[in-house]
A protein has these predicted regions:
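Conserved short alpha-helical segments that host acidic/polar catalytic motifs at enzyme active sites
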Residues: 1-223, 228-288, 293, 381
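Flexible loop/turn segments at secondary-structure boundaries
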Residues: 85-86, 116, 180, 188-189, ...
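Generic beta-strand/beta-sheet core signal
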Residues: 109, 174, 182-183, 194, ...
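Secondary-structure transition/capping motifs at alpha-helix termini
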Residues: 129, 150-151, 284-288, 306-313, ...
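A conserved beta-strand->alpha-helix junction
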Residues: 133, 138-141, 312-323, 420-438
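Phosphate/diphosphate-binding loops
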Residues: 160, 208-209, 216-217, 221-225, ...
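PRPP-dependent phosphoribosyltransferase catalytic core
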Residues: 162, 177, 214-220, 372-478
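Short, glycine/charge-rich flexible loops or terminal/linker lids adjacent to PRPP-binding catalytic cores
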Residues: 309-354, 365, 392-398
Length: 478
């Protein structure tokens, strides 16, 4: 419900025998729909022949029974759901990306955001390479293919490509004979794998996706690790594993991931409950009821209620048939959707002092409208509490906040923000508090650069989402 936009979810499956894998991928993607609702797609490998389909829209609308039939059988398949953080919302930017090269074919699905995609793409274009999309995923594909021409195996090519691509990426790669999963050396985005009772190996962005297809969770893929699934079993390549400290994006726990997922050993639901408990201790207020913003604020609201002793109530009802507000790129569209997405429970909040819990405030537009809804429903006070610190820095690793321009916390004090959104008071989770919601030690931790400005990698210049479109348009105008 917050105004944050994340990017994608990936899914891959390797089967020892040929079968209708697209049906399994469909269910896997359906359980990852929360990670991206702009477009989706599936690619299937049938004895080295790749079939694929992708389009704009939700999984249920794009991957129809007729599409599943046309994709046919195979023993390897990959799938993707997208919200773009580099490149616009065009069909050409939908994934998986399927490419043919002199040594065969490759399909790639990627979750994350490169910080050097512009530089790499410029190098490729200077050498005559042609790009068909404006996504950084195609930059990854070009890099792997260039390395593949020199390497003996696809996994060697991926390993060498990881020396060149910088930033956040969790990806699945399909070659004629193998399924490969790879995670960047910081582990910004989650990736895990499991195994079904039928012997299929399944890779997914979140463990909830494994559950949906009946796969038993085996483990998370480590930061910097490459895992290869093939006819000879599983191979792990850890050449890049010890290069950096793990810095998983903390918003995976706060917002992005489904509460029934386990990421890097931590249950997402428990992390959100704990965030709410800490928030209550750090930002107490006298009130009658605690209300969470559906769906992302509900678990933290339960934690706040538990720690404060203030009753929890369902004060806002979500229309489940309206997509997440952040999926609609234009601000006006997002604001219009809020009107029909949430409805206050007047009988619950009328005459009450309400504590409203959400996971973040980025621009403030959505928060202000929700506060207004509660007041119109009869709430006599609305105290907003946020289960994350103020968002004051751009994210370069997969959240669609590429500039400080629209970050309300960069422009106003907490008291001023409270006034702008119409809340009686406003409180945020502290930096120390957010570090306590998961496992943090000398070897692993969170990326909280959007809160404290300490980036785990070299700080890039601010990169705008549609930079490749702008470059193309500039070339056309010459």
């Amino acid at each position: 419900m917050s105004e944050i936009r994340e990017e994608c979810g990936v899914f891959g499956i390797y089967s020892p025998k040929k079968e209708n894998l697209s049906q399994i991928v469909y269910f896997g993607l359906f359980s990852l729909q929360h990670r991206g609702q702009e477009s989706c797609g599936i690619a299937v490998n049938n004895e080295g022949i790749f079939s694929s389909y992708k389009d704009l829209g939700l999984v249920n609308d794009v991957i129809t029974p007729s599409v599943i039939d046309k994709l046919g059988e195979g023993n390897i398949a990959v799938g993707h759901v997208r919200y773009g953080t580099t490149g616009g919302n065009e069909r050409s930017n939908a994934q998986p990306i399927v490419v043919n090269h002199i040594k065969g074919s490759m399909a790639l699905a990627h979750n994350g955001n490169l910080i050097n995609s512009y530089e790499l793409r410029s190098e490729f274009e200077a050498k005559g390479s042609i790009f068909h999309t404006t996504s950084d995923t195609e930059v990854i594909a070009h890099t792997i293919i260039e390395e593949r021409l020199k390497a003996d195996t696809i996994e060697e090519a991926v390993c060498e490509a990881m020396n060149r691509i910088k930033g956040a990426y969790s990806m699945v790669i399909m070659s004629p004979q193998k399924l490969i999963a790879a995670r960047d050396e910081n582990g910004f985005r989650p990736l895990c794998y499991g195994k079904t009772a039928n012997g299929e190996y399944v890779v997914a962005s979140e463990s909830c996706s494994l559950d949906s297809v009946g796969a038993e969770f085996i483990r998370d893929i480590e930061k910097g690790e490459i895992v290869v699934f093939g006819k000879d079993g599983i191979t792990s390549i850890k050449k890049h594993c010890n290069k950096s400290k793990q810095t998983l994006c903390v918003f995976e726990y706060i917002y992005f991931a489904r509460p029934d997922s386990i990421i890097d050993g931590k249950n997402v639901y428990e992390a959100r409950i704990k965030a709410g408990e800490i928030l209550a201790k750090e930002n107490p207020v006298n009130a009658d009821i605690v209300v969470g913003v559906p769906d992302s604020g509900l678990d933290a609201a339960l934690g706040y209620s538990k720690a404060s002793g203030i009753p929890y109530g369902i004060g806002l009802i979500k229309n489940k048939y309206i997509g997440r507000t952040f999926i609609h790129p234009e601000v006006k569209s997002r604001m219009d959707k809020v009107k029909i997405k949430l409805n206050p429970m007047a009988n619950v909040v009328k005459g009450k002092r309400v504590i409203l819990i959400d996971d973040s405030i980025v621009r403030g537009t959505t928060s202000g409208r929700i506060v207004k809804l509660l007041r119109e429903a009869g709430a006599i006070e609305v105290h907003m509490r946020v289960s994350a610190p103020p968002f004051v820095n751009p994210c370069y690793y997969g959240i669609d906040i590429d500039s400080k321009d629209n970050l309300i916390a960069c422009k106003y004090t907490i008291e001023e923000i409270a006034k702008k959104i119409g809340a009686d008071t406003l409180g945020y989770l502290s930096l120390d508090g957010v570090k306590k919601i998961g496992y943090v030690n000398e070897k692993s931790g969170f990326c909280i650069a959007c809160f404290d400005g300490n980036y785990p990698t070299k700080i890039p210049t601010e990169k705008f989402k549609n930079r490749f479109e702008r470059k193309i348009n500039e070339e056309k105008s010459k």
